[in-house]
Design a protein with these regions (language model features):
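Formylglycine-dependent sulfatase
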Residues: 2, 9, 14-19, 23-438, ...
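C-terminal helical cap and adjacent loop that interface with cofactors, partners, or active-site loops
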Residues: 443
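Short, charged, surface-exposed hinge/linker loops at domain edges
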Residues: 482-495
């Protein structure tokens, strides 16, 4: 009896010590802040040397940590890309969450679910997961967390910019946090998503704009790109205010900071396209626990890698469903854990309501090393959407639809001036049907203007990339690669306008 009592006392003391250590560790668990802009391509940060975009706060995060120069989003469209980030799975692995404007079934585990279950306070401001209907998926809140969108600006700084006061909402979230409670927060800016102000700019300002090679170098293009840059700056300003809040709270050094974008710029042949400017996004990460500053990583990384990184940084076990590689070792100085030859993947299904019977334009992409391979398994469909739709029972005028391109000054110029010899080249780049397979050296041709799929000198390499992408799609259960692509067409569109189009044989 005496021995039992001593052992019990010893066990109790040891247990108390363990609980004390556990509580101390719990108080030191890292916070997580993810800042994600809406439709923002990789070249357009001042850290990348852009002459017309200013992002001092994104740059500061990179300077205090890492800049990943070849980061790829999960999709060239909002909701599937965000779903890939949240679930740690490629968009083709997550059913209706992998298409645009559908649902997000509760049985797909997100890192937010894991963090909340482990005691993290979770929230978001601005745009979380969407567009789509998360209630239809059986969820009780947006997959990005608890919504904080009550605080509004008295006046938006510019037409087209949201009145949501992102920084004030983050302040409210922090004020509600219990002392010592670890937190995760998703700052989802609505910028630089269209629509824009379409106002004039001084000539000297427009002269700074760098027009990509897939857009016409016109005043309309320059005006729109300058509007785009000002909206990126708004995103960056609120990021800066959030960093100030973290510093004032003494939490900056204990917070994993991730700054990125959901997909590329909202221009023709970028957003909603499997080319580099549709999926290649900015990425800056700060992790003070690693002690590394100002590191530039050239190896391609994907959104599924970020998902695994968040989970491991929080001290949790990465679920088997999360297929990415955690970059935590990289953030702690082991850069070599990312192999130079590792592939990253992206893809898309339906974007907007743009075709007969709401059909999609599926694409799958793989970036490895210097090359990007693109598979478009329905090459007879128009990549930007059907040229004409049906309004009040009548066909709209020729070339008046193409709804997979967001409405903008550039789009209207392409459509109305398509007969112009100069403008017409860019019109056809944006809307013409494309080959089933394309292959680009994105190191030399980041605008994806020179398809190497038919080049004899690249035939062996192209076959290798094509085979690797196909094998990956089959092994991860992509319905398109398994010959059951109709699955994607059957997912309902639950958010966004529904339009009507002529049958394929009459659509041109």
């Amino acid at each position: 009896m005496q021995t039992f009592t001593r052992r019990s006392t010893l066990l109790a003391l040891l247990l108390a010590q363990c609980l004390s250590v556990s509580a101390g560790d719990d108080a030191k668990r890292p916070n997580i802040l993810i800042a994600i802009s809406d439709d923002h391509s990789w070249p357009h940060t001042s850290a990348q040397g852009s002459g017309f975009v200013e992002t001092p706060n994104l740059d500061a995060v990179a300077s205090a940590g890492f800049r990943f120069d070849n980061a790829y989003s999960g999709s060239p469209g909002c909701s599937p890309s965000r779903a890939a980030l949240l679930t740690g799975q490629h968009h083709w692995m997550i059913g209706p969450a992998g298409t645009h404007g559908s649902s997000f079934p509760v049985y797909y585990t997100t890192f937010v679910d894991l963090l909340e279950k482990d005691g993290y306070k979770v929230g978001f401001t601005g745009k979380g997961w969407g567009p789509g209907d998360w209630l239809a998926g059986g969820r009780t809140k947006n997959p990005a967390g608890v919504e904080y969108n009550e605080k509004k600006l008295e006046q938006a700084p510019r037409v087209g910019i949201s009145k949501t006061d992102y920084a004030a909402n983050f302040r409210q979230f922090m004020d509600e946090r219990r002392e010592g409670e670890p937190f995760y927060f998703w700052y989802g800016a609505h910028e630089p998503h269209l629509k824009y102000a379409e106002e004039g700019h001084p000539e000297e300002v427009l002269a700074k704009v760098e027009v990509p090679g897939f857009l016409p170098d016109t005043e309309a293009s320059r005006r729109m790109l300058m509007d785009y840059s000002l909206e990126i700056n708004h995103f960056d300003n609120h990021l800066g205010m959030m960093l100030d809040i973290l510093e004032a709270e003494g939490e900056l050094e204990n917070t994993l900071l991730i700054v990125t974008a959901d997909n590329g710029m909202p221009m023709p042949r970028a957003k909603a396209n499997g080319y580099d400017n549709g999926i290649h996004v900015p990425l800056a990460v700060r992790w003070d626990k690693g002690g590394i500053k100002g590191q530039v990583v050239d190896t391609p990384v994907g959104f599924v890698d970020l998902s695994a990184t968040v989970v491991e940084a929080a001290g949790l076990e990465i679920p088997e469903s999360f297929i990415g590689q955690s970059m935590l070792p990289v953030l702690e100085g082991n850069i070599d854990t990312l192999e130079d030859t590792r592939p990253v993947f992206s893809g898309r299904e339906r974007h907007s309501s743009s075709r007969y019977q709401n059909l999609s334009y599926p694409q799958r992409m793989m970036r490895r090393g210097d090359y990007l391979v693109v598979w478009s398994p329905e090459p007879n469909r128009f990549p930007a959407g059907t040229p004409r739709n049906i309004v009040d029972g009548e066909l709209s005028p020729p070339h008046s639809a193409y709804f997979d391109i967001d409405d903008s000054e550039i789009k209207r110029e392409l459509l109305t001036k398509r007969e112009d010899p100069y403008i017409g080249k860019f019109f056809h780049l944006a809307v013409d049907k494309r080959p089933e397979w394309q292959f680009f050296n994105v190191r030399e041709d980041p605008e994806c203007l020179h398809d190497l799929a038919g080049d004899p000198e690249h035939a062996q390499l192209f076959a290798e990339y094509r085979g690797q992408l196909t094998q990956t799609l089959v092994s991860t259960g992509d319905p398109r690669a398994l010959g059951i692509g109709q699955v994607w067409e059957d997912y309902p569109r639950l958010r966004g306008p529904m339009r009507y189009f002529p049958a394929p044989e009459t659509e041109e």
